[in-house]
């Protein structure tokens, strides 16, 4: 019984708790699939899509976002010192041979409890796997985690992701 208690405390300390200096209120991800509002309090993802009539509609996707996923994104944010980045940080793909200009953006917006925001944007032409051409090794893990989470949400709600060309 004593060992189970020790393992439980270790689990809480290392895996399920948020970072000590956590002041992130919510996380918003914008990409070609839509806009995903991720929040621990809401536990749902809201997605905006353009309709044929050029209106921006909000569609509630019935998908639970686990605290584990959000805490992992927060942990990557703080462990890689991304709070030291400027409030609007843009990255371009390392794909210099592309015939297409960078046209698809994946943007992560962090909303903080003090009302501030931080935008991290990655521009790429969208062909093949964009994460293979990611320029900054320090920021890449957070984009990998967000890409996996949005892919999981889209696939589980019946909206299959497009096959890379």
Task: Give the role of each language-model region.
Residues 38-41, 56-65, 116-126:
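Short amphipathic beta-strand/extended segments with alternating polar/hydrophobic composition
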């Amino acid at each position: 019984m004593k060992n189970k208690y020790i393992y439980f405390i270790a689990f809480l300390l290392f895996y399920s708790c948020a970072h000590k200096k956590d002041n992130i209120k919510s996380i918003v991800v914008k990409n070609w699939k839509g806009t995903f509002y991720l929040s621990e309090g809401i536990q749902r993802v809201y997605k905006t899509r353009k309709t044929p009539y050029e209106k921006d509609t909000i569609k509630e996707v019935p998908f639970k976002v686990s605290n584990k996923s959000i805490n992992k994104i927060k942990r990557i944010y703080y462990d890689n010192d991304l709070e030291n980045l400027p409030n609007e940080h843009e990255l371009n793909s390392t794909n210099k041979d592309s015939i297409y200009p960078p046209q698809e953006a994946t943007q992560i917006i962090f909303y903080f409890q003090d009302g501030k925001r931080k935008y991290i944007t990655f521009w790429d032409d969208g062909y093949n796997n964009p994460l293979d051409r990611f320029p900054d090794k320090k920021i890449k893990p957070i984009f990998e985690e967000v890409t996996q989470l949005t892919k999981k949400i889209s696939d589980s709600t019946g909206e299959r992701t497009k096959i890379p060309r």
